[in-house]
């Protein structure tokens, strides 16, 4: 079905109603049916209408294939109630329609509903207001600028409608104009946001994306200026990568094929080349995904449920969930059987299904911390957060555990003051910052060195700086002037008073990682005694009353340990899950359909980047993907594999926030790993978006017939009575003359019958007969001359009979 996309905005349900009813009345097959020994034409049965309308809704781009047959029956009942269809006796106004062979037909009246002329007050920050200055470009002819009075008479309303129609006609006269470059860029931005909202299934993008950050010219450039491999081609070469960086990246990506052995090489040559590339990207003024889009990409990961939970804790939490909610899976199909009294609600439910918000599903969106502190946070806070993430968390897996990737702040029990949950996706480490006192107490208990002699290890390699922060090649914080040491039993400490953030929260939780887990440039081998001691310290069977902040800190440590369990040691902690000896006991919660959603959403989000950043991201992802898959690549680090090194090195130069306190290194690492696995799909040009823009531009530039040039209705011209009599006689005589000629020229008619018909004609129309045969000669000539004397009889010779002799 050739349909247009109904954009989210005012009167969307009315537009959907007009769209569906228009196609239903125009294309629904009508035929002859028999019922109760009678035949009825131009009608259809209820079952035929349900089958045809169901297929129509499934193929329509506004609804999709998720429309059920029961929803189609509800829509047909609304059609019967609103007089879109009626039964054979002309009855309508009720919803008494079943899936049977009852006959229905279309009435003569049009079911199209008029759209109110007054637009609502738009929010200044809403997505629909982004291209507000080009409102006339996407304006429908049914919209009216003038609002009629509520209590006006019928005549005044008709006059008002005529004035509005004339005004729309004047506006349509200059409508098929040439679109400017700015208009086409606005179309690119508008359609991109529509597809992104449809992919995520959110009612609005306000909680995910700031409309002021959208630059349609970037989207258009990234879609149109590409090479045959899909890489952005920059017209301004000043923003491109330097030639020496491109040469180094090409050398590493094609190692050892592209390595010219004629040049002087030495041991560790590939490490120096890699360090050169890493130095360039880590010294960029901002990350490749830019600071302003940090929230966008993190929210995409959170909305899609991109969290991993180990099996050791998963069983306990799942049992806990089942005891509180014994049958949560039955609530998924409530919308299929839900009855809508409002036609608008029914149409909008067909467009997109959003499950009802429930208090039992809070833990799926907020993770483990929310489960332990659910009683201390008000209901409205959870409702606000669930509005953005609730549907995708439940859609990912019912009864499973979400990840603790939100920044939740709780207060002490004795104060009774509850802090507000932040709407944005924030750092796991930010939780520790919000309760710094108790976190330091927890860290001092966890990281307390033993009485044994500590072993010192100085970071000797030169750190690579990113902005104002010191970074090692592995991407973890390490300052030149800080001396790290490790105790023999596995504890951590520092000579400086304040612990580095990656050490204080991240590195203290490496007890469950493999033996080759990297921490900066130091290789740490966790001992069995440390693991046993930390498991005992974090034992969930501790029933002693503790302070609320300490409870939050203990849950934080457990959650961060669980998330880091499969991120650092394994080569890939993403879907599809990989079996690795270092990542045993982990289970991925990202379902296959949500993985596809994440790929499509990130594909559109990467189009919002500046062209220079998108090109650098494409080349970087190609390089690190080839390096991680290259078996001939020498080891670039003594303590970790190539893939882990790529992720830890370039995670901060790909995704980073302006404020260090909000940086979530775990999500950044997972995003880079996800980009490595799916960079060919994410960073390619979406063909469907380009087709949608071209179709919309052609729709706006199509030639139109001006209103009023061709009359829509034709009326008979009034004539006088004399002219009517003259026309009546002339037309009648001409027809009678034609009848006479047919009798005369009919050769198949016998002469006797022809004479009989001519006599009858002469008796009825003597004047016309006289004009055709003025004399008897002309009449005789018609039959020809025939002799009146009979021919003499033939003389037959009589036979002679012989006499009979006796």
From Swiss-Prot:
SMART domains for the chain: DEP
Q: Which residues form a coiled coil?
A: none
Query: Is the keyword Cytoplasm assigned to this protein?
Result: no
Gene3D superfamilies the record matches:
Rho GTPase activation protein, Winged helix-like DNA-binding domain superfamily/Winged helix DNA-binding domain
Q: Which SUPFAM superfamilies match?
A: GTPase activation domain, GAP (SSF48350), Winged helix' DNA-binding domain (SSF46785)
Q: Which Pfam families match?
A: DEP (PF00610)
Q: Where is this region: Disordered?
A: 142-177, 564-588
Quick one: a GO cellular component term? Answer: transcription repressor complex
- Keywords in alphabetical order: GTPase activation
Q: Which residues form the DEP domain?
A: 24-108
One annotated GO molecular function: GTPase activator activity
Q: Which InterPro entries match?
A: DEP_dom (IPR000591), Rho_GTPase_activation_prot (IPR008936), WH-like_DNA-bd_sf (IPR036388), WH_DNA-bd_sf (IPR036390)
Q: Domain of life here?
A: Eukaryota
Record field: compositional bias (Basic and acidic residues): 167-177
GO biological process entries:
intracellular signal transduction
Boundaries of each Rho-GAP domain copy?
279-319
Q: Which PANTHER family match?
A: DEP DOMAIN-CONTAINING, DEP DOMAIN-CONTAINING PROTEIN 1A
Name of the molecule in the record: DEP domain-containing protein 1A
């Amino acid at each position: 079905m050739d349909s247009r996309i109904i954009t989210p905005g005012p009167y969307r349900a009315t537009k959907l109603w007009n769209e569906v009813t228009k196609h239903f009345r125009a294309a629904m097959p009508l035929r002859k049916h028999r019922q109760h020994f009678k035949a009825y034409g131009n009608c259809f049965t209820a079952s035929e209408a349900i089958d045809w309308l169901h297929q129509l809704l499934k193929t329509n781009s506004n609804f999709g294939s998720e429309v059920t047959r029961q929803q189609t029956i509800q829509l047909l009942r609304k059609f019967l109630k609103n007089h879109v269809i009626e039964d054979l006796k002309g009855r309508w106004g009720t919803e008494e329609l079943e899936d049977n062979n009852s006959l229905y037909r279309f009435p003569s009246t049009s079911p199209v509903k008029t759209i109110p002329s007054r637009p609502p007050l738009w929010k200044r920050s809403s997505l629909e207001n982004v291209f507000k200055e080009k409102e006339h470009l996407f304006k429908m002819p049914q919209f009216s600028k003038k609002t009629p009075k509520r209590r006006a008479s019928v005549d005044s309303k008709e006059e008002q409608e005529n004035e509005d129609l004339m005004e729309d006609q004047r506006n349509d006269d200059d409508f098929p104009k040439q679109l400017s470059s700015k208009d086409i860029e606005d179309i690119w931005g508008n359609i991109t946001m529509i597809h992104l909202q449809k992919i995520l299934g959110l009612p609005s993008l306000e909680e995910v994306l700031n409309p002021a950050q959208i630059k349609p010219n970037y989207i258009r450039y990234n879609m149109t200026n590409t090479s045959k491999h899909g890489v952005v081609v920059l017209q301004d070469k000043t923003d491109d990568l330097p030639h020496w960086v491109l040469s180094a990246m090409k050398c590493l990506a094609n190692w050892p094929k592209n390595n010219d052995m004629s040049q002087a090489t030495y041991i560790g040559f590939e490490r120096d080349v890699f360090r050169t590339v890493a130095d360039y990207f880590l010294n960029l003024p901002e990350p490749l995904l830019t600071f302003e889009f940090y929230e966008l990409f993190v929210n995409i990961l959170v909305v899609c449920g991109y969290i991993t939970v180990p099996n050791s804790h998963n069983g306990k939490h799942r049992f806990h969930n089942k005891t509180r909610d014994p049958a949560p899976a039955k609530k998924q199909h409530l919308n299929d059987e839900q009855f809508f009294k409002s036609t608008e609600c029914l149409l909008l439910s067909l467009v997109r299904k959003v499950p009802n918000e429930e208090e039992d599903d809070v833990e799926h969106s907020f993770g483990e911390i929310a489960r332990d502190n659910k009683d201390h946070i008000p209901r409205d806070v959870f409702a606000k957060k669930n509005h953005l993430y609730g549907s995708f968390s439940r859609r990912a897996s019912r009864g499973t555990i979400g990840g603790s990737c939100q920044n939740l702040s709780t207060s002490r029990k004795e104060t009774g003051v509850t802090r507000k949950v932040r709407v944005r996706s924030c750092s796991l480490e930010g939780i520790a910052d919000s309760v710094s006192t108790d976190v330091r107490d927890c860290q001092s208990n966890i990281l307390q060195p033993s009485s044994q002699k500590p072993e010192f290890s100085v970071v000797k390699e030169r750190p690579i700086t990113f902005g104002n922060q010191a970074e090692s090649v592995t991407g973890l914080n390490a300052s030149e002037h800080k001396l790290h040491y490790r105790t023999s039993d596995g504890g951590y400490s520092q000579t400086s008073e304040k612990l580095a953030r990656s050490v204080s929260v991240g590195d203290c939780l490496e007890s469950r990682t493999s033996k080759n887990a990297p921490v900066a440039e130091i290789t740490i081998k966790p001992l069995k005694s440390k693991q046993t001691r930390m498991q005992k310290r974090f034992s969930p069977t501790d029933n002693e009353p503790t302070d609320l902040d300490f409870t939050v800190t203990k849950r934080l440590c457990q959650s961060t340990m669980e998330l880091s369990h499969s991120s650092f040691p394994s080569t890939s902690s993403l879907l599809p899950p990989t079996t690795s000896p270092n990542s045993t006991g982990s289970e991925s919660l990202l379902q296959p359909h949500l993985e596809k959603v994440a790929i499509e959403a990130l594909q559109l989000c990467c189009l919002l980047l500046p062209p220079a950043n998108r090109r650098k991201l494409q080349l970087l992802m190609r390089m690190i993907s080839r390096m991680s898959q290259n078996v001939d690549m020498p080891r670039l680090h003594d303590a970790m594999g190539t893939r882990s090194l790529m992720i830890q090195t370039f995670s901060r130069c790909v995704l980073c926030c302006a404020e260090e306190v909000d940086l979530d290194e775990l999500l950044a690492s997972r995003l880079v790993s996800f980009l490595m696995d799916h960079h060919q799909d994410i960073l390619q040009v979406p063909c469907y978006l380009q087709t949608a823009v071209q179709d919309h531009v052609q729709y706006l530039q199509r030639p139109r017939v001006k209103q009023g040039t061709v009359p829509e209705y034709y009326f008979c011209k009034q004539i006088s009575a004399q002219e009517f009599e003259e026309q009546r006689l002339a037309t009648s005589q001409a027809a009678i003359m034609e009848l006479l000629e047919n009798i005369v020229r009919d050769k198949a008619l016998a002469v006797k019958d022809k004479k009989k018909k001519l006599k009858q004609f002469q008796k009825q129309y003597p004047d016309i007969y006289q004009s055709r045969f003025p004399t008897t000669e002309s009449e005789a000539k018609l039959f020809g001359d025939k002799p009146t004397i009979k021919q003499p009889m033939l003389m037959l010779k009589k036979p002679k009979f012989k006499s009979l002799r006796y």
